[in-house]
Amino acid sequence: MKIMVVYYSAYGHVHRLAEAVAEGASEIVDVEVVMRRVPETLPEALLKKIGVFEAQQAFAHVPVCEVAELETADAILFGTPARFGNMCGQMRSFLDATGGLWAKGALVGKVGSVFTSTGTQHGGQESTILSFHTTLLHHGMIIVGLPYTFQGQSRNDEITGCSPYGASTIAGSANDRWPTENELAGANFQGRHVACIAGKLFQ
């Protein structure tokens, strides 16, 4: 069984979550986990100006995803930073190129799940994931979130991401807050949970 983790990350926050998601999925027996980045759409000059180009070098080793690869997976976990309460433009551009897969129903019946990062505590974590689900539903995917059996999302002793819709983190307005132990645990749980659900469906 093959699980793909497909994401976009600017400063590395979503990348950290993606690693935790992949680790969780890989804990399930007979699961192949593949990590992929979606293509960058911003010009290099701008990326350098805002510090993204340098930050992305830390995970430049992760191969860029080809649209056709999605068809080979049994489950796909998508990671995106929030942009005004929606997925980022890079992810939107990538998904807009999946029309050919949609036309032949290539993703119908596959498991889909989403995780995210926002700049602020109420910066659109839930709306980003929920609006992302619309695209997955158009593809006929089976949506899996982060159930309350991950008890870390009920904590009130610290500021934390994660909701029943998916794992998340808060980067901070200066992008200087990194995923906490609890947020990474949520991402790990989500990866493992998706792999378990996919296993029940496809093995």
UniProtKB/Swiss-Prot annotation:
- E.C. designation(s): 1.6.5.2
| Recorded catalytic activity of this chain's protein | a quinone + NADH + H(+) = a quinol + NAD(+); a quinone + NADPH + H(+) = a quinol + NADP(+)
Any one GO CC term of this protein is: membrane
Q: Which SUPFAM superfamilies match?
A: Flavoproteins
**Which cofactors are reported in the record for this sequence?**
FMN
List UniProt keywords, sorted A-Z: Flavoprotein, FMN, NAD, NADP, Nucleotide-binding, Oxidoreductase
The protein's GO terms of the molecular function aspect are: flavin adenine dinucleotide binding; FMN binding; NAD binding; NADH:ubiquinone reductase (non-electrogenic) activity; NADP binding; NADPH dehydrogenase (quinone) activity
The cross-references to Pfam families, in alphabetical order and at most eight, read: FMN_red
Residue ranges of every copy of the Flavodoxin-like domain listed in the record: 3-194
Q: Where does FMN bind?
A: 9-14, 82-84, 117-123, 138
Entry superkingdom:
Bacteria
Query: Which leading EC class covers this enzyme?
Result: oxidoreductase
Q: Which residues does the annotation say bind substrate?
A: 102
Q: Which residues bind NAD(+)?
A: 11
- What does the cofactor section's free text say about binding? Binds 1 FMN per monomer.
Of which family is this protein a member? Answer: Belongs to the WrbA family.
| Protein name as it appears in the record | NAD(P)H dehydrogenase (quinone)
What organism does the UniProt record list as the source? Syntrophus aciditrophicus (strain SB)
